[in-house]
From Swiss-Prot:
Induction field: Expression is induced on squalestatin S1-producing YMG medium.
Compartments (UniProt record): Membrane
GO molecular function: squalene synthase [NAD(P)H] activity
Swiss-Prot/TrEMBL cofactor(s): Mg(2+)
Transmembrane segments: 397-417
CDD domains named among the record's database cross-references: Trans_IPPS_HH
Pathway: Terpene metabolism; lanosterol biosynthesis; lanosterol from farnesyl diphosphate: step 1/3
Protein name: Squalene synthase R6
Lineage, top ranks: Eukaryota, Fungi, Dikarya, Ascomycota, Pezizomycotina
Record key words, sorted: Isoprene biosynthesis, Lipid biosynthesis, Lipid metabolism, Magnesium, Membrane, Multifunctional enzyme, NADP, Steroid biosynthesis, Steroid metabolism, Sterol biosynthesis, Sterol metabolism, Transferase, Transmembrane, Transmembrane helix
Length: 419
């Protein structure tokens, strides 16, 4: 039920309401789960997938049946790994062997873990991990090899950061990108190998690891920018000291509401946004190499959400006060764009890149570099689709005109009735 406040919001922001209605009414599923024929373990896997990420499960469940369970299991395995790494109640002595051996643990169909902290978001996944392991055992050997290899890479990478104490503060930019590689870049590698193995993506994608890496880096870096306040409150700092030390003596100054500190904090966030934004054209290049529609949706939606989130965070002091997220209307518009074709995905990227440019502050030390990164996105799109126009802007204008005419019509009718 929409509140009165919500109704007023959408009436004053009609560009938010239209995509929500379109998504609800017109969106069709590329594929659909056959829940009637699923075993209890399969249903349990989807249940825990939904607990870990509602947005991801919605996209995952529409995948081609060939990839549906392998990717579901892949995600749950890595989520289990991530849950161990994230748990601040576990000592390094407990974490390290769990992380390094997780690629063999997934073959134990009776393994469960009950020692996660009581407030750990995904502890139930580990408590009932045996159902994931049993379904993993049924996955094709070709997919099993890929999942095992990526789990080993990620587990060892996470363990290295835990042992070195990096999770309480990343020092250098190269450390930051290495961390993002282990928690997201290798995920992109695994997904690409699964896509190519299933013959739903161009094999040439595997020949360009830079594109694969950028897909993971773009998502993870955007999440780290958005979550800066939440991580600070948990005494975890992923923004590299090499960056933030240019703007503050300690990290507390960045999240301080004092005006002179806030200006420096925004300049720091601009540098963080710039690092992520420079990956955007690689992401578009990767997406264009995906053939099958459900897989296209699967890779395009998160990237479109990321560029929108990056735009929301850019020059936004609220990121230092609370966790922020894009609106439902924006999310629905992005999902509409990302489940059609490459041209619509490009329109979404162009739309948000232009908004970033519009928000760009000439007094910011990264002003010119931010503009250059946005122009790089424009050049990629113009190179692929030289005649592509931002039809969304035209559609929004037309919708506003129709709405205004409707309001004027109602007002005129009311006035006539009073005569």
């Amino acid at each position: 039920m929409v509140s009165a406040r919500g109704i007023l919001y959408y009436l004053s922001h009609p560009q938010e309401l239209r995509p929500m209605i379109q998504w609800k009414v017109f969106h069709g599923l590329a594929h659909q789960r056959d829940e009637k024929n699923e075993s209890p373990d399969v249903q349990a896997c989807y249940y825990y997938l939904a607990l870990t990420s509602r947005s991801f499960v919605a996209v995952c469940q529409q995948l081609d049946p060939e990839l549906l369970m392998p990717i579901c299991i892949f995600y749950l395995v890595l989520r289990g790994l991530d849950t161990i790494e994230d748990d601040m109640t576990l000592s390094t002595e407990v974490k390290e062997p769990l992380l390094r051996n997780f690629h063999t643990t997934i073959y134990d169909q009776s393994w469960t873990f009950h020692d996660s902290g009581p407030d750990e978001k995904d502890r139930e996944l580990l408590v009932h991990f045996d159902c994931v392991a049993r379904e993993f055992a049924k996955v094709k050997d070709e997919y099993k090899v890929i999942i095992t290899d990526i789990t080993k890479k990620m587990g060892n990478g996470m363990a290295d950061f835990v042992v070195n104490g990096e999770l309480t503060g990343v020092r250098k930019i190269e450390d930051y990108e290495l961390y993002c590689h282990y928690v997201a870049g290798v995920v992109g590698e695994g997904l690409t190998r699964l896509f190519v193995e299933a013959k739903v993506a161009e094999p040439s994608l595997l020949e360009n690891p830079k594109l694969i890496e950028s897909m993971g880096q773009f998502l993870q870096q955007t999440n780290i920018i958005r979550d800066v306040r939440e991580d600070h409150d948990e005494v975890r700092h992923f923004w590299p000291k090499e960056v933030w030390a240019k703007y503050a003596d300690d990290f507390d100054q960045l999240v301080s509401p004092i005006p002179q500190n806030r200006q420096k904090a925004l300049q720091c966030s601009s540098e963080m946004v710039l690092m992520a934004l420079n990956r955007a054209d690689d992401c578009l290049n990767y997406i264009s190499g995906v053939r099958e529609q459900s897989v296209f949706n699967f890779v395009a939606i998160p990237q479109s959400m990321a560029i929108a989130t990056l735009e929301l965070c850019f020059q936004n002091p609220a990121i230092f006060d609370k966790n922020i997220k894009i609106t439902k209307g924006t999310a629905c518009q992005l999902m509409m764009d990302s489940t059609q074709d490459m041209q619509h995905v490009c329109q979404a990227f162009r739309r948000h890149a232009r908004r970033i440019q519009k928000k760009n502050n000439p007094k910011d030390p990264h002003f010119h570099d931010i503009n250059a990164a946005c122009n790089k996105i424009e050049r990629f799109i113009d190179g692929r689709y030289p005649n592509l126009q931002d039809e969304q802007a035209k559609a929004d204008t037309m919708y506003l005109v129709v709405l205004l005419l409707g309001i004027l019509g109602v007002a005129a009718a009311v006035l006539m009735a009073k005569r």
